[in-house]
């Protein structure tokens, strides 16, 4: 699952970069992307060494968040799964969410696509107990470009 998760994040990054909203462009303006939520539903998990591809599109852009969806396709191009994600652009200085519409004059909304994603939007998970579920020893290789533990390490 972590390999698929990394492919989803890379696909999102390439898609954003091709449209002028990649991490390098955001960093020039002291912003960065952070993944807030991710939901993945698969009918079939691609086997090791089996070819697959990923399509991605932006469903919505709000002031502080954007919804990005994915279709996971087998080697014949048939959808075998979908994913939905919620991303925020944060200030690298304050670490707080930043207004997505301030970058490039709000042109990020030009990339909203009217394409269906058949799975439910990821919601917040309500924590009812304050008991730790597990512990994880962070390694240097777990840290991403933002200085956070990479989202996929949580899967």
What are the language-model segments listed below?
Residues 1, 101-102, 139, 150:
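Generic structural signal for alpha-helix starts
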Residues 1-51:
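Hydrophobic, proline/glycine-rich low-complexity stretches
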Residues 28-33, 78, 127-131:
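A generic structural signal for short, non-catalytic loop/turn and secondary-structure boundary residues
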Residues 41-124, 128:
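HotDog/MaoC-like acyl-thioester-processing domains
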Residues 128-141:
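Short amphipathic
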Residues 151-155:
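Short, hydrophobic/π-rich interface segment
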């Amino acid at each position: 699952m972590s390999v698929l998760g990394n492919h989803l994040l890379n696909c999102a990054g390439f898609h954003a970069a091709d449209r002028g909203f990649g991490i390098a462009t955001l960093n020039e303006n002291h912003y960065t992307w952070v993944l807030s939520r991710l939901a993945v539903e698969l009918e079939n998990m691609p086997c090791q060494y089996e070819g697959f591809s990923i399509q991605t599109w932006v469903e919505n852009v709000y002031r502080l968040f954007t919804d990005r969806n994915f279709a996971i396709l087998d080697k014949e191009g048939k959808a075998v799964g979908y994913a939905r994600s919620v991303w925020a652009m944060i200030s690298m200085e304050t670490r707080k969410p930043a207004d997505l519409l301030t970058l490039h004059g709000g042109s990020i909304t030009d990339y909203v696509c009217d394409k269906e994603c058949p799975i439910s939007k990821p919601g917040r998970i309500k924590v009812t107990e304050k008991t730790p579920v597990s512990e994880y020893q962070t390694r240097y290789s777990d840290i991403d470009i933002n200085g956070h533990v990479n989202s996929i390490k949580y899967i």
